[in-house]
């Protein structure tokens, strides 16, 4: 089925192929990617768009000696297939299987781990300068998309790289006019002008002449260097950064890509190659709707994505999106902000209904946070919809620009906790620890969809910054009540009365805690707020129970359990305390339910942990053991 591809077990095999066979190989590679992703789920559109570019890079450069650094990394399936992992693609994004992103511990061809955007140029520059310092003759190539190029970090790296005339650095701009959502901002308009301007047609023709009427390589390299500015718009933005800019060229045309890359290898100083690709290339359904096919689940390629006949549970993202529209209808001060995650964060409907109050700032989390702060200074009520893992990138702005000035910005933190197939790079494991230590900041942890809507309303009515964290996907299936009624600020509730031990649940783990409690006979408290902690309720529960257990889908170290321990200590209460949450480790990709079970955070794991630590204080009929004297404090 894949006669050429099955002969390629490494890029060395690829480089032994005659150039005339590369087009056929690319076709097989694209078909293999489509077949693989349709069976496992994963990123599709971006990978179909990078097939020829991947083939060309591995064909021209001596990988892994020459370093390829893939920005974001979700477009690396062709790269993985060509670098000896073809037979493992059936395990993609599954527990114990291939990662959906580059990982240094997975292959020597994955020279730098990526998953968050805009890091590739910095890493590749570091590699290029390290090679130069150590006297090693190798290239470093950063492959970055036009969406990722909009981030400040990419421009910081360009600014630094442009002064190093002695490094062998190539930046390949993969211009597919898409990030996850369509890219926005002045840079995108600038690239569009390069593509559509009157100069482009003649530039492209000059480029073809230089490439096809080819003298010997050394002479051609000199001509390319001399004529580079004649191939594109003069004094481009990237040339002003100190790069030699070449392009745009067709990123699906191997006859253009390979000679261009071969010639660039002989040029001195930092090089910038602008290639134009199409997301979903070669699969008509993905070409027509690259957003829908950005990260599909399993599907039949012949039929395409199909809507499920079974009614789907409402996701937390959808609950947020509906709340945002409803609150915007009621309060004209509300503005919605997203760093390039309109679809992922549930803001499509808000954008349609309130276009003048919707702001997609691009992949620019630092800017998004301070932009929101500026709006709050002028009396608006900004809501920043952002994944928990991406808020990490705007941490200084969170402290310096929002919290220090005590500005009323709401942070809707999607993908809090484990995220499943995307793995450690996307896990929202750290938001409670890094948020609760900031003065003026509050953190809400809804247990279900109804609480999510109400706690968003609670957050919105505050005059200081508040984050509401909620997980990916659906929850317990509790239908949100209509209206915009808030829950009391900083207050929890007792959900189940028991004895001996009380489980203090923060967020959606309330429901497995309730399941475990039915067998254990213990009390369950829905804490709702990691900050401010409901200390009144906490001390009341502590006084009437012999031991406490905290439960959170987040890092144990510094998390909500730590907050409970601090509060008990401040009150002078020595109370046995068991903290359950995510362990001090990076948690691999896999099925979310399996990952929670492995962390001991499903109902069975919670029951086992409580029994192991506090079985002696449970009712004899629950523990299966004779009653024992009360525990002494270990706090």
From Swiss-Prot:
InterPro entries: Dxylulose-5-P_synthase, THDP-binding, Transketo_C/PFOR_II, Transketolase-like_Pyr-bd, Transketolase_BS, Transketolase_C, Transketolase_CS
Pfam families: DXP_synthase_N, Transket_pyr, Transketolase_C
Cofactor(s) essential for the protein: Mg(2+); thiamine diphosphate
GO molecular function per UniProt: 1-deoxy-D-xylulose-5-phosphate synthase activity; magnesium ion binding; thiamine pyrophosphate binding
UniProt: Mg(2+) binding residues: 146, 176
Record's keyword annotation contains Magnesium: yes
Signal peptide boundaries: none
HAMAP family per the UniProt record, alphabetical: DXP_synth
Assembly and binders: Homodimer.
Protein name per its UniProtKB record: 1-deoxy-D-xylulose-5-phosphate synthase
Organism ancestry: Bacteria, Pseudomonadati, Pseudomonadota, Betaproteobacteria, Burkholderiales
Gene label: dxs
